A protein has these predicted regions:
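Single conserved hydrophobic/aromatic residue that forms the stacking wall/gate
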Residues: 1-5, 9-10
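Short, conserved glycine- and acidic-residue-centered signature motifs
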Residues: 2, 28, 115
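C-terminal lobe/tail of nucleotide-utilizing enzymes
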Residues: 40-148
Length: 148
């Protein structure tokens, strides 16, 4: 992530807020921190709505109650707490995500699956934080990058 690159991407865009997505590894969390700092920078000034931890754990199809933390445990959860930001969701690695993608069927279609439940929880969290943001901050405007 670079401030200059991000300025080019968001210039002339109306951005309600940013959602930072990361995996739980320390190196990925370092990049997530940079992303948070970039959006909160005075030149960009985009509110952070929250964090999403992708690949939070692996759950095998045969043992859906088991969780294997392949990339570390609660990395985004801890970062969210440290940065005083909401953790919007922890999305597991589930074999069905890959299979559904290969078949062209959204993984969330099977409403009983852990994947669908994770994405539904994420969607509900996003609605909550956007409503909260809209209640306490001015209406979304086109981002004007301050080059001072």
């Amino acid at each position: 992530l670079s401030l200059v690159g991000s300025e080019m991407c968001i210039r002339d865009s109306a951005i309600t807020g940013a959602i930072i997505v990361s995996t739980p590894q320390k190196v990925a969390l370092a990049d997530a921190r940079k992303g948070i700092d970039m959006y909160l920078n005075d030149k960009v000034n985009v509110p952070i709505l929250g964090l999403v931890e992708n690949m939070a754990w692996f759950t095998p199809k045969e043992l859906p109650e088991n969780k294997y933390f392949l990339f570390g445990k609660d990395g985004c959860k801890n970062l969210a707490k440290e940065m005083e930001l909401p953790l919007l969701a922890q999305i597991p690695i589930v074999q069905g995500i890959c299979e559904s993608g290969d078949e062209g069927v959204p993984a969330a279609v099977n409403t009983e699956s852990i994947v669908a439940q994770s994405f539904l929880s994420l969607a509900q969290s996003v609605v909550t934080v956007v409503n909260r943001r809209n209640a306490r901050l001015p209406k979304t405007k086109i981002v004007e990058v301050n080059n001072k």
